[in-house]
Amino acid sequence: MSTGIWIMIVIIALLVGAVGGFFFARRYMENYLKNNPPINEDMLRTMMLQMGQKPSQKKLHQMMTAMQNQSKK
C-alpha cells in the first residue's frame, strides 16, 4: 500500500475515535447526572428539616454558597 492510503486510514481512525469518544463521554455524563443529581435548595431544606433544624432562607443561601465554593476547589 502507498503512504497516502496509510495516512488517510490514520486520519479516518482518529476522527472516528474522537466522535465515538465524544458520544461515549456524553452518555456517561447523562447517566451520572441522572443517578447523582446536583443538590439544590429544596433538597437542602428537606435535609435540614429531617435533621430537626428550621431552615431559614439565609442559612440555605450560606450552605449553597459554601457547597459551590467547595466544589470549585
From Swiss-Prot:
Subcellular location field: Cell membrane
InterPro entries: UPF0154 (IPR005359)
UniProt keyword terms in alphabetical order: Cell membrane, Membrane, Transmembrane, Transmembrane helix
Membrane topology summary: Single-pass membrane protein
Family: Belongs to the UPF0154 family.
Top-level taxon in the UniProt lineage: Bacteria
Predominant subcellular localization, coarse grouping: membrane
A GO term from the CC aspect: plasma membrane
Lineage, opening ranks: Bacteria, Bacillati, Bacillota, Bacilli, Lactobacillales
Regions crossing the membrane: 5-25
Listed name of the protein: UPF0154 protein PEPE_0872
